[in-house]
Amino acid sequence: MKTTAQIRQSYLDFFHSKGHQVVESSSLVPHNDPTLLFTNAGMNQFKDVFLGMDKRPYTRATTAQRCVRAGGKHNDLENVGYTARHHTFFEMLGNFSFGDYFKHDAIAYGWEFLTSPQWLGLPKEKLYVTVYETDDEAYDIWNKEVGVPADHIIRIGDNKGAPYASDNFWAMGDTGPCGPCTEIFYDHGEHIWGGLPGTPEEDGDRYIEIWNIVFMQFNRHADGTMEKLPKPSVDTGMGLERIAAVLQHVNSNYDIDIFQTLIKKVAQLTGEKDLTNKSLRVIADHIRSCAYLIADGVMPSNEGRGYVLRRIIRRAVRHGHLLGAKETFFYKLVPTLADVMEHAGEIVNQKRALIEKTLKAEEEQFARTLERGLLLLDDALSQVKDNVLSGDVAFKLYDTYGFPLDLTADVCRERNITIDEKGFEREMQAQRARAQASSNFGVDYNNVIKVDGQTEFKGYETTSLSSAKVVALFTDGKSVERVQSGENAVVILDRTPFYGESGGQIGDTGYIATDLAAFRINDTQKYGQVTGHIGQLESGSLSVGDTVSAQVDTERRLAVAANHSATHLLHAALRKVLGDHVAQKGSLVSESALRFDFIQPEAISKEQIIEIEAIVNRQIRENISVTTEVMDIEAAKQKGAMALFGEKYGDLVRVVGMTGFSIELCGGTHVKRTGDIGLFKVVSESAIAAGIRRIEAVTAENAINWLNNQQNILNQSADLLKSDTASLVEKIQQLQDKAKKAEKELQQLKEKAAMQAGSDLAKSAVKINDISVIVQQLDGIETKSLRVMVDDLKNQLGSGVIVFASVVEDKVNLIVGVTADLTGKVKAGELVNLMAQQVGGKGGGRPDMAMAGGSQPENVGAALSACSDWLESNL
């Protein structure tokens, strides 16, 4: 029996033997494709090739593509664990032809791989195929050339309510490449319910689609007409987990080797004995998507891809809770996953430390609110009417306890309860409206500037040009032929020394001029293939066709270059100190400072910051040569050049190196030697999102100015404390010691006063059914003193209930004390929470002592009344 890893390798080997280039799986984060949340099909990385916008050095390719379907249009999350074949993560085996072979070879290859004893050796009688109703060519190839009998070939027409809307007709969109497809199904046997494609029972599990072969042969126009493509192409997909189930003689994907290994590990970690428990399936599936998403640079957050990852992690943690997991367990599955995925697990092994740290931190964070959220949900579900949970409760769970809607839906599903999703969405929209700040945006020239040709960038060699031609002018969002003095405009030149903002580096400033005109450039931006010089005409007039000189603000450019080169040194130093998991997530390089965002799941210590600074400054002092070289991207990767995550690179790339220390793909401007940076100083380090840290730093003169400013602060502080700077720490320590001593003495006085007040309050106790009760408002008394008073009164009363409320600086403090003999009747935690609800707060504690806080002092009277009423009714 073939393992899943062996099937994956067999597929790639087969198509390599047929002249296909084996291409590595692309990232789960699509490159520059805003239409996709995650890579969800093998063809995603070849989309531009199919559209004719990109060319590859090969016309045949094969891949084992990792895919995620959770969130967005393709969202399988809610079904995962409850069906045999839904997953958040799966591998798609694919072979592709870019204007090379077509239907005959695509069908022949598929049949050979599936049925040949040399490869998979499936029984031919177990296979059925579908073709598009009018695709006689594909039908004849299957029937007459391959030899599939007619009763095993099914024609599928337009079954989705519109022309060409069919399970067997594929389209990239409303317009563009499209064509019929043929699908191959496997018959699991008559002991399993289900019917053939096209029958009412087709959704059963007997006949399972294992391969889809798409024939891209038409270009659909906006009017619906179909034009034949000059070079038709082929896109295929076969789910690895599905074909593994077939070859391993199981009906459910969760019974294949990969999942069974993971399921057994989950059971071991959680103590679950029943290996058919659906929660085991959920967790085994979710560790795959979570680990690979983190490996591909996604970190848990509250928006976009990061929020989908957070939802998956929290769903897995909740199912672990159902299984009885008492401690963090999810991250412990990573080594097992890396092993069982074999070659496809290499990226998980490389990023293992980052994945484990991220998952553990996220699980610990969610565990703090999971229990309370589940109690709230359980209480709400016990009061549900008509089997519908209200949208506002679902939203409160989301907003307060971090419960994604699908996690709440999971719990409801187990009790046959649905959620009022419209009500949830109303609450969500109301929150968005409250949070939305008013914005006033200018003209978006990205949608305005359409210019033939491109701007040639000369800024690597020079910061000035004596001659450049104005090819277009834009003002107020419109193309114009001429601009006059005082007008703001965007100037497009045929060539320029000005760097357009990209890669985190801000755009250049400066001037362009003629003999009679001067245009001040305040910013430079890239608009597709052209560069826009944004600014104001200070004198004269400027027309399309004019010849101008161009001069960059050289001093500013050099300051920007110093910060950009320092960013590369910082990146390399971070990886040396923190580890290879560090990867850039964003940057800003200006003339005054640099900002660098990077993956790092833990806080960075002060000692590590000092070490990072020292490494960067050592490289600056060594005055290393900074080199730039244009080369083939594969050669750059072999040299170890780091690429910016999420960027899409062409076949030729620019490599910036700092001999023996840093090498990165980069299109920015840099110093000639590291000594030109002068000095590097970190001014701040912080977290900006879960697993993402930010360092801000200054260089050269800005670093000296920053240090001088810090020295001034030290000098002023020393003067105020009548000390010198060398003795400043000692002086502050002495003052702190004095302050602590005075604070301790003050607290002792307060406690003495509180005990005296407690003696007086004991006399005010009332009896409820022979039980002593004190309910009082004591404003201005802090929590610590209240606790002393309660303990003293419990001793004095011997048996009783003491309740105090105090308002200090508009904050409400509540405390309830119950003597040990009464905790069976009165739970301090329940009573304090009853009061806390009245003052907009929450609290907790032991049965004999509990505390709460609140933000609504005007409701303290109501809280005490509610407490008294409860005691009257329950004692």
Swiss-Prot record:
Enzyme Commission no: 6.1.1.7
Entry's localization field: Cytoplasm
Catalysed transformations (reactions): tRNA(Ala) + L-alanine + ATP = L-alanyl-tRNA(Ala) + AMP + diphosphate
Keywords: Aminoacyl-tRNA synthetase, ATP-binding, Cytoplasm, Ligase, Metal-binding, Nucleotide-binding, Protein biosynthesis, RNA-binding, tRNA-binding, Zinc
Pfam families: DHHA1, tRNA-synt_2c, tRNA_SAD
One GO BP: negative regulation of DNA-templated transcription
Residues annotated for Zn(2+) binding in this entry: 564, 568, 666, 670
Entry remark concerning the domains of this protein: Consists of three domains; the N-terminal catalytic domain, the editing domain and the C-terminal C-Ala domain. The editing domain removes incorrectly charged amino acids, while the C-Ala domain, along with tRNA(Ala), serves as a bridge to cooperatively bring together the editing and aminoacylation centers thus stimulating deacylation of misacylated tRNAs.
Protein name in the entry: Alanine--tRNA ligase
Name of the encoding gene: alaS
